[in-house]
Amino acid sequence: MIHIENIKLYRNEKLILDRLNWQVEKNQHWAILGLNGSGKTTLLKVINGYIWPNEGKVQVLGETYGETYIPKLRRRIGWVSNAMIDNLNWQDNAIEIVLSGKFGALRLFEEVSEAEIEEAVRIMKQFNCDHLANKTFEYLSQGERQRIQISRAIMANPDILILDEPCGGLDIIERENLLQTIEQIAGRENCPTLIYVTHHVEEILPCFQHVLLMKDGKDAATGTREQILTEPVLSNFFGRDVSLQIQRDRAWIAVK
């Protein structure tokens, strides 16, 4: 699904990604954990073909970057992020935002069929946001906007769905509701490969069986959640002693 081989990326002579390696296989769901400035979002931009590494090899969905037509490939990758929200037209109704995902556009310019509208409503209903269909996007809460954005991504029937810090700015209730939505996606038949990016350990749901730790643009560690979500590994990663508890199959940490 994703093959990143020894990539290096510079911006203004600063090394952003440093000999990073990462491989995602079919039917795997991954969490990427890293502090601010670790290179997480830059890696996502590389995967989506928005920026190119200076060295190394990138393959996504069997296509090698530099040898394929990126805009066409990009339609097979859903990306949910706060940066994407800012690019949407906030004056559109929620269902128009969702329908735009069908065409890989930021606005709905195409004529849509009754079947496509029904599909959008069905997807929104799965994520408990169909009642928002005719609401103006601008007046939705942050949590509601994230549900609409996820519905928009699913509308395109992607092979990979990237969730870039989707809980950022949410209160604890909205966060848990959104995480429940993500669990629902993971439990769906023919679910896309999920990539969940965060700097909060407790957001790594049980469905994310593999974890990539990123630090200073490097792959600090990769492995199963059982291998990575341990006190020794996380203490070394954060550079501080942490205690870890497992509650509801999720890891919760505190600095000692």
List each model region and its residues:
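Conserved ABC ATPase signature
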Residues: 136-140
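Conserved ABC ATPase "signature" region
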Residues: 99, 114-132
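Catalytic Walker B motif of ABC-type/P-loop ATPase nucleotide-binding domains
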Residues: 161-164
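Conserved structural motif at the start of ABC-family nucleotide-binding domains
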Residues: 2, 16-19
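Conserved ABC transporter NBD signature motif
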Residues: 56-66, 73
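Helix-to-loop junction immediately C-terminal to a conserved catalytic motif
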Residues: 48
